[in-house]
């Protein structure tokens, strides 16, 4: 049985500045339409790039540490026990950074099982993701690479 205080981290993320670990607690518990993840972010690292979602609202709980939260309103420090909601769309944009000396632990809850589109404003990317139980599609593009709806399409023979 999964435990948020002793999680089995099943998704390491290793990229300079974004090293962290994720335990997909919801999936480990057998949830199909509800996601819950414990994130552990070492000092000097970010959990993920600044982004917002089009389909998934998120609810974040700080379990340990004092992460810095970036939103459209700016930066602020969170404390253990704080809860923050990130609605869909630009107003829900967020990023968590550990500027402290101890590891940060977060619990994030969101819907699962729906395709998701994420926008990364700092890098001008858009991500398209399938979610469990389907999974498979995970692609990122520069927003400037957009093409016309009909590009490459030929009308059917009549």
How does the language model describe each region?
Residues 26-34, 45-58, 74:
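A short beta-loop-beta micro-motif enriched in histidine and acidic residues
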Residues 20-22, 37-53, 91:
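Conserved short histidine dyad/triad with adjacent acidic residue
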Residues 47, 57, 64-66, 73, ...:
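A generic structural motif
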Residues 38-42, 53-71, 109-113:
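Short, conserved beta-strand element in jelly-roll/cupin
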Residues 30, 88-115:
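Ligand-binding loop in jelly-roll beta-barrel domains
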Residues 72-88:
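Short acidic-glycine-tyrosine-enriched beta hairpin
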Residues 1-33, 119-158:
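A short, N-terminal "cap"/entry segment at the start of jelly-roll beta-barrel domains
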């Amino acid at each position: 049985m999964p435990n948020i205080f002793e999680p089995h981290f099943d998704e390491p993320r290793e990229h300079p500045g974004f090293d962290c670990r994720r335990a997909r607690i919801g999936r480990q518990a057998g949830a199909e339409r509800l996601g819950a993840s414990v994130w552990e972010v070492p000092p000097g690292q970010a959990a993920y790039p600044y982004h917002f979602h089009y389909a998934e609202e998120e609810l974040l709980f700080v379990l340990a540490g004092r992460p810095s939260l970036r939103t459209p309103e700016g930066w602020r420090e969170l404390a253990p026990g704080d809860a923050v909601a990130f609605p869909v769309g630009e107003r829900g944009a967020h990023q968590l950074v550990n500027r402290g000396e101890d590891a940060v632990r977060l619990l994030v809850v969101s819907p699962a099982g729906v395709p998701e589109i994420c926008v990364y404003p700092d890098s001008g990317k858009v991500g398209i993701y399938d979610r469990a139980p389907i999974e498979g599609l995970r692609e990122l593009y520069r927003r400037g690479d957009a093409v016309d709806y009909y590009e490459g399409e030929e009308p059917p023979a009549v």
